[in-house]
């Protein structure tokens, strides 16, 4: 392309400070260096993680910054040493990476790349410690190595998944974060078999993606657990057969589920990050063979392990970004995985702050933001 090797001036939504509306600015995006790729972002979606770091909740503030990490685009140019991608390739940027050389990448069981594992505080490129974005010569920091709230962005090649060019980027862009996280927690970690019972705790986008995985696996009974009764109707689109609101019961929700399933579910996936929900998810699985997935710290009686329950943690659904995500896209292309039902809003890039407002009000699942007006 004519822009290869040159600085590109483009629009980007810049977060200048915590909690303030993003500002549409003209930024300069430098060409990719060794083992880097410059992508033209066509579609990006807003994830709760973007909002969390925009608000700087409990984190080290890194501003000014270009947020965004769930997106789809086309390779504009590549840096020295990049051999797997060429300009024109359709790609998904990913907030974590796969160098294909470290012990984790060589393992069939792990996706925690030593080189490119998620780093929320790093606002620069990993190779030279510099930002590729500037305004009037001053650096604008990156976010999760992706910064997809920009028309063009430079990303390490290990954080870019090449996908089927026939796949619609306005749909599969969702797979670069939340949907794959939930889907893989079910398909790759808890691995329910056809006819099993599955409980999903937390029915946001990640939880519903986990539920979609249970549906795809042929689970005979899928129990959705959430404190918001309005989530029930929406969950039915994802295969939910039963809905339990812990506030409707006087006993712990795990006891309710054990009673309604004659001893417990076969699999449980916890998608809230709440310690109490983790305990409930673990203790509602059947003794002897139950498997529960969790996201963080929790406490339970050691006897629950002696009773042959299994607890598993996972990151990004256990998918390796470069070698695993193309297969998830293929699931969508084969009509096994349904993505349209996750998309509740669509907006032009100029209205990106409206997407933040929608999420802050708890409206919808995913808002897809298109770069073209």
UniProtKB/Swiss-Prot annotation:
Q: Quote the catalytic activity from the record.
A: a primary alcohol + NAD(+) = an aldehyde + NADH + H(+); a secondary alcohol + NAD(+) = a ketone + NADH + H(+)
Required cofactor names: Zn(2+)
Q: Which GO terms describe its biological process?
A: formaldehyde catabolic process
What's one GO MF term for it?
Answer: S-(hydroxymethyl)glutathione dehydrogenase [NAD(P)+] activity
- Binding sites annotated in the UniProt record for Zn(2+) 1: 47, 49, 69, 177
The residues that the entry says bind Zn(2+) 2 are 99, 102, 105, 113
Binding positions for NAD(+)? 49, 202-207, 226, 231, 272, 316, 366
Q: Which domain of life is it from?
A: Eukaryota
In the UniProt record, which is one GO cellular component term?
A: cytosol
SUPFAM superfamilies linked: GroES-like (SSF50129), NAD(P)-binding Rossmann-fold domains (SSF51735)
The entry's an alcohol-binding residues are 49, 69
Keywords from UniProt, A to Z, are:
Cytoplasm, Metal-binding, NAD, Oxidoreductase, Zinc
Q: Tell me where it resides.
A: Cytoplasm
Q: Which PROSITE patterns match?
A: ADH_ZINC
The reply to whether NAD figures as a keyword in the UniProt entry is yes
Here the disulfide bonds are: none
Q: What is its EC number?
A: 1.1.1.1
Q: Give the main location.
A: cytoplasm
Name any one Pfam family assigned in the record: ADH_zinc_N
**How is the quaternary structure described?**
Homodimer.
What protein is this chain from?
A: Alcohol dehydrogenase 2
